[in-house]
């Protein structure tokens, strides 16, 4: 599976620390200190998202998709960075946000506005730990299985998501499964009218 997000954020930490060292050498302490803090947070995320550790609970995302105040304060350099990175990447790539891979089953990226949701009032399975639940989803059935980008959910999370999705499909609800960018792979099979979802996240 590779290092994925861990490698990216580790590189970011190194760059921030180098820039902080440069400004510190110029005597610009007020600039270097925030950069050092952002570098420390990035390194913490790098370690927590490494496959050997894989600790998405670090960021404190709740089951309702919200982040507590302490998380916004402590991890603001990372949370704001990833939020802006997702929006910028979406603007630059200009790719379809979601794809219907089976009847009533959609996979895609983080829906930041109502235009980014399939037009069928779907039940939503959120596979991100870095992005908050969008106000767009306030009226949608919602399940959060917090997962680092480019990482796979735990088997117990997959099993829970499968059962939840099967219940929603039995109620004739469409399902929207999303990660941050919509670039993860999702394998779907339908057996005896029961929806079985197997999530395989790969670095892309």
Segments the model singles out, each with a brief description of its role:
Residues 172-192:
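A phosphate-binding catalytic loop at a beta-strand-loop-alpha-helix junction
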Residues 1-103:
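Non-catalytic regulatory/accessory regions that flank a structured catalytic core
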């Amino acid at each position: 599976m590779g290092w994925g997000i861990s490698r990216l954020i580790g590189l970011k930490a190194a760059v921030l620390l180098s820039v902080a060292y440069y400004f510190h050498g110029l005597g610009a302490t007020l600039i270097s200190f925030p950069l050092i803090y952002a570098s420390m947070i990035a390194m913490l995320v790098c370690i927590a998202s490494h496959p050997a550790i894989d600790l998405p609970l670090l960021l404190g995302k709740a089951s309702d998709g919200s982040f507590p105040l302490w998380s916004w304060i402590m991890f603001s350099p990372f949370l704001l960075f990833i939020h802006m990175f997702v929006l910028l990447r979406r603007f630059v790539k200009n790719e379809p946000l979601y794809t219907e891979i089976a009847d009533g089953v959609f996979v895609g990226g983080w829906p930041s506005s109502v235009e980014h949701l399939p037009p069928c009032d779907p039940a939503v399975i959120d596979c991100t730990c870095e992005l908050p639940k969008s106000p767009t989803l306030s009226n949608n059935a919602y399940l959060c299985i917090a997962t680092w980008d480019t990482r796979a959910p735990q088997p117990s999370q997959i099993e829970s998501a499968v059962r939840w999705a099967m219940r929603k499909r039995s109620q004739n609800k469409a399902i929207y499964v999303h990660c941050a960018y919509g670039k993860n792979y999702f394998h779907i099979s339908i057996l005896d009218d029961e929806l079985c979802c197997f999530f395989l996240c790969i670095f892309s």
